[in-house]
Amino acid sequence: MNSVVTQASPPVYGQVERYINRELSILDFNLRVLEQAVDPLNPLLEKLNFLLIFSRNLDEFFEIRVATMLEHFVQERDIQTADGLSPQEILHQISETAHAAIERQYQILNEQIFPQLREEGISFLRRGELTQAQSNWVKKYFQEQVAPALTPISLDPAHPFPRLVNKSLNFIVTLEGKDAFGRQIDLAVVPAPHSLPRVVRLPDELTEGKEHHVMLSSIIHTHVSDSFPGMTATGCYQFRVTRNADLTLTEDVEDLAEALKDELSSRRFGRAVRLEVNKNCPTHIYEYLLKEFDLDTHQLYRVDGPVNLARLVSDFKRPYLRYEPHTPVIPKILKKSANIFSAMQKQDILLHHPFESFSPVIRLLREAAQDPHVLAIKQTLYRSGANSEIVQILAEAARNGKEVTAVIELRARFDEESNIAVANVLQEAGAVVVYGIVGYKTHAKMILVVRRENQKLVRYAHLGTGNYHAGNAKIYTDYGLLTTNQDLCEDVHRIFQELTGMGKMVKLKKLLHAPFTLHSQLMNFIENEIVLAKAGKPAKIIIKVNALTEVQLINKLYEASQAGVKIELIIRSICCLRPGLAGLSENIRVRSIVGRFLEHTRVYYFYNNGDTRVYCSSADWMERNLFKRVEVCLPIENTGLKKRIYQQGLENYLMDNQQSWLLQSDGSWCRNISTEDQKPHNAQQMLLGDII
């Protein structure tokens, strides 16, 4: 009798098993940021800073992602998410996770950060802790600095509940007595002046050499009765409302800048999505506020401390409680060269920020602005800052008679006003300013300089993974390439033509660009590794990006894993791919690095049977980057630069066992910390010492 051997069928996974929800993955990233506030590797004031970063991130999460999901729910839209969760299910899970995270945030602040700061001589004094002299000083500060800027608003039929600005600090005050007109007033709202600092330092002569601070909220609370003469304030409670801050622009607008200005004014008063109150706020008060803002109880967050932690900043005089100062390195070839053009003619120059200085990029623009042989400068600007040195140099170049073209992305989220101001500065200087393509954000990072040399026109280019923002370049990790490779420079020239003109899609020699060729080529590169793996050859993919959400690429990576391709993903923030699932993704490992610097480099590595492909790009692996943005992907062809990026920018991070987190198959993240028998490896710290 012959025995029949049946082979087990591979597991079949549904949507929820295959994909991690995008919104919940964003929250998970912010939880990793929050854990930095208790990481013993971080100095005390840096721990506090991570608490504030967590607050800012969460504010934006509610303003954009929660607000969008709430709109889907209210409008009963049948949206299709890769994981199959409905808006209602997503909002429920967000609420549970966010409430727990915020409670932990304030627990860390009150039980760890504040006590440790007090041990170092830095205190945030409550009303009952002030000496008489300090109380007198605070009262005078209130009378001279705060009271003149306050606008108390009584709540009665003639004074309806005011429209309060998004994320502003406010107080609701319960009152007894009658006002000057004999009216019985029970409630009033007092908005805190946004122009005043949220933390006020007491004079040294009143603190015995210690660094004592008082919260603005505490000052207003103590003296709020002064704003209601003849009445008694029986209660004063902080609150803060977060509103929908997403902008909606139609594609048929005649003037993008003017349309944006109109939208920006409405952002301050969008639909409420979250209410924060202090824990001492009585039930009848927060229920009243919930009703006024049309919010449900699950959208209420009761916190044990100031409701506006994102603004809890002060210039603390304790440098030893911060990271050691770091001076970015300038490549040797640039130190030796009299001008940057001669250095770039000798070789391509790779810059790895913030370990290497951003100043060579500024130097390129400055020398171009002043060089009589330079004819034209073209640059994309996504986030640069209104007071940017780069913007001033471009304006100077235009005034010097150079042909300056700036492609400014007005719709860079939360930088819209700044970018409108930048556009005005450059237009007044005589530069040509365009706003890119309606319906597609221009996210590519490119500079092109055209210079006359020996009766010929020679092009110089810079391509990068990060914004032309000198401040961000000190805290974000990014790559930039200074090059005179004429194929690359020609490609950059053609993309600028595409952005400023109205022609058809241009054909490029070296660069990949979204929304045209990038996605399809990435699919082809993964397919090539699949073919090699099936042929029994080594196959490997390493991807380092900020986010991975695009379903076609995720499915292609699953296919590659099933074929035996070894895949390492270094994803700082959102990851919708689920690793380690038997029969689907057991050859995929996902890690996230969260540390001193914000990881921002985008690097794609494909083994390609030993003839490695290495790309640096402005694009994350997200639908918006690949299909709704103008992005550039740069091949690194120089063998030495390839090796350097692999060793420093990929392998180094795969070895990290100090700042890394590993994504588990159940969607949770596990801290990857070295054991006693392992040598500690901090990728960012290694780069601080290794960059030459």
Swiss-Prot record:
Pfam families: PP_kinase, PP_kinase_C, PP_kinase_C_1, PP_kinase_N. It is an enzyme of class 2 (transferase). The lineage of its organism: Bacteria, Pseudomonadati, Pseudomonadota, Gammaproteobacteria, Moraxellales. Belongs to the polyphosphate kinase 1 (PPK1) family. HAMAP family: Polyphosphate_kinase. GO terms for molecular function: ATP binding; metal ion binding; polyphosphate kinase activity. Keywords: ATP-binding, Kinase, Magnesium, Metal-binding, Nucleotide-binding, Phosphoprotein, Transferase. This is Polyphosphate kinase. It catalyses: [phosphate](n) + ATP = [phosphate](n+1) + ADP. Its EC number is 2.7.4.1. Its cofactor is Mg(2+). The active site is at H443. PANTHER family: POLYPHOSPHATE KINASE. An intermediate of this reaction is the autophosphorylated ppk in which a phosphate is covalently linked to a histidine residue through a N-P bond. Mg(2+) binds at R383, R413. Catalyzes the reversible transfer of the terminal phosphate of ATP to form a long-chain polyphosphate (polyP). The keyword Kinase applies. SUPFAM superfamilies: Phospholipase D/nuclease, PHP14-like, PPK N-terminal domain-like. Gene3D superfamilies: Endonuclease Chain A, Polyphosphate kinase middle domain, Polyphosphate kinase N-terminal domain. GO terms for biological process: polyphosphate biosynthetic process. NCBIfam families: poly_P_kin, PRK05443.1-1, PRK05443.1-2, PRK05443.2-2.
